[in-house]
C-alpha cells in the first residue's frame, strides 16, 4: 500500500540532517578544536551579518543620562545610548555608584515590561527574581539594556497588547525580508554596549543571559572576545529539543543557523573561559533532557582544554527562571 501520510515531519527532519555541518573527527586534538573554534566564530559572525551591520549602522558610542531612581536602595541610572545609526538603546545601570571595574552585562529575555520587569516592582515575570538589584547590592555595576523589540524599544504603532514577545514579530519579519535577523541586530547592539562599558573603564566584563537573553549572551560571546565570564540561565539546550518542538518567538531563528552548529556547540566556543550553565528542573521551555545533552557537549570542550574546573553546570529546583543562590556565589568567586 502506498504511503498516504501527509505530515511534514519526515521532510523537515531529512532536510535538517542533510544540512548539518561536518563534525570533528573522533580523535581530534586540542589544536584541532582551537582551529575549529576560530572557524566557527567567523561563521557565526557571518551568519549574523555583523560586519555588514557595522558597515551600515556603526556610529561613535555616546550616552546621555536621562533619569535616576532607586529601587530597594539601589541607585539606577537610565541612559539613552547611541552607537547604532537610527537606533537609541535604553540602558539602565543598577549600582551606578559601584566601581566600574566590576561590570556585568545583564541581557533579559521575553517580558511584557522589557528590562524594567527586573528593575522595578511591577507585575513582573518571576524569572528575573530582581537579579540585577541583588548583584548591584553585591557591589557590581550592572548594565541592563532594553533590547530592540521590547518595552520602550518597540516598533512604533504596533499594538503589543499584553504580549511578552513585545514587537519581536514585526521587527523580525522586516529584518528577515532585508536579509538580517533580530539575533544578529541584538548581537551588534550588545557589542555596542560593551564598547560603552569599556569607555566606563570596565576592567573585566561578565555577561549574564536569561532565556532569550541567554541566546543573546551566547552569540555575543562568539562575536566579541572581550567577554571574560558568562552565565546562561534558562537557555542551554539542543535546538531539536526545544526550537523544533515548541512555539518560540521569531527572534530565536536565523536562516541557515543549523548549517553552522547547534546551540551547545556555539556555547562551546567560549571555552576555556569561566562559564556557568543553569537550568530549572521543571523548565517547560528549554526541556531538561535537551539541557543535559547541552551540558555534556560543552563539558567535552572544557575537557579538551584540560580545564573542567572552568565550567560549572547545575540543575536547580525550579522552572523557567534563574537561581540567584547559584549566580551570586559564582560571581563572588570570579569577579573580585
What role is predicted for each listed range?
Residues 296-336:
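C-terminal catalytic histidine-bearing segment of alpha/beta-hydrolase fold enzymes
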Residues 107-188, 242-244:
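Cap/lid segment of the alpha/beta-hydrolase catalytic domain
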Residues 185-259:
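Primarily recognizes the serine-hydrolase "nucleophile elbow" in alpha/beta-hydrolase
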Residues 270, 277-279:
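Short beta-strand/loop motif that positions the catalytic acidic residue
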Residues 76-78, 85-95:
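A short loop-to-beta-strand scaffold at the N-terminal edge of the catalytic core in hydrolase folds
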Residues 177-180, 227-267, 285-294, 304-307:
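Mobile cap/lid helix-loop segments that gate and shape the active-site cleft of serine hydrolases
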Residues 1-75, 83, 117:
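N-terminal targeting or regulatory segments adjacent to alpha/beta-hydrolase or S9 domains
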Residues 91, 101-111:
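Short beta-strand element of the alpha/beta-hydrolase
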Amino acid at each position: 500500500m502506498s504511503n498516504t501520510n501527509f505530515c511534514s515531519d519526515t521532510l523537515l527532519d531529512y532536510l535538517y540532517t542533510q544540512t548539518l555541518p561536518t563534525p570533528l573527527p573522533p580523535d581530534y586534538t586540542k589544536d584541532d578544536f582551537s582551529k575549529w573554534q576560530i572557524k566557527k566564530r567567523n561563521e557565526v559572525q557571518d551568519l549574523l551579518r555583523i560586519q555588514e551591520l557595522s558597515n551600515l549602522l556603526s556610529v561613535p558610542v555616546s550616552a546621555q543620562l536621562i533619569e535616576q531612581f532607586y529601587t530597594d536602595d539601589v541607585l539606577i541610572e537610565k541612559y539613552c545610548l547611541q552607537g547604532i545609526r537610527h537606533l537609541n538603546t535604553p540602558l539602565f545601570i543598577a549600582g551606578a555608584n559601584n566601581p566600574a571595574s566590576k561590570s556585568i552585562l545583564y541581557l533579559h529575555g521575553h517580558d511584557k515590561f522589557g528590562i524594567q520587569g527586573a528593575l522595578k516592582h511591577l507585575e513582573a515575570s518571576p524569572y528575573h527574581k530582581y537579579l540585577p538589584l541583588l548583584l548591584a547590592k553585591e557591589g557590581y555595576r550592572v548594565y541592563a539594556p532594553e533590547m530592540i523589540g521590547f518595552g520602550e524599544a518597540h516598533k512604533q504603532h504596533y499594538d503589543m497588547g499584553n504580549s511578552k514577545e513585545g514587537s519581536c514579530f514585526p521587527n523580525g519579519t522586516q529584518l528577515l525580508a532585508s536579509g538580517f535577523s533580530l539575533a544578529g541586530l541584538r548581537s551588534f547592539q550588545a557589542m555596542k554596549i560593551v564598547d560603552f562599558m569599556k569607555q566606563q573603564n570596565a576592567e573585566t566584563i561578565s555577561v549574564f543571559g536569561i532565556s532569550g537573553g541567554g541566546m543573546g549572551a551566547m552569540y555575543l560571546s562568539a562575536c566579541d572576545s572581550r567577554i571574560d565570564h558568562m552565565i546562561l540561565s534558562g537557555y542551554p539546550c539542543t535546538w531539536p529539543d526545544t526550537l523544533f518542538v515548541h512555539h518560540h518567538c521569531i527572534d530565536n531563528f536565523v536562516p541557515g543557523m543549523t548549517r553552522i552548529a547547534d546551540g551547545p556547540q556555539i556555547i562551546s566556543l567560549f571555552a576555556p573561559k569561566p562559564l556557568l550553565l543553569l537550568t530549572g528542573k521543571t523548565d517547560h521551555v528549554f526541556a531538561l533532557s535537551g539541557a543535559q545533552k547541552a551540558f555534556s557537549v560543552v563539558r567535552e570542550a572544557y575537557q579538551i582544554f584540560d580545564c573542567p574546573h572552568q565550567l560549572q553546570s547545575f540543575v536547580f529546583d525550579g522552572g523557567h527562571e534563574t537561581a540567584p543562590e547559584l549566580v551570586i556565589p559564582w560571581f563572588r568567586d570570579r569577579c573580585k
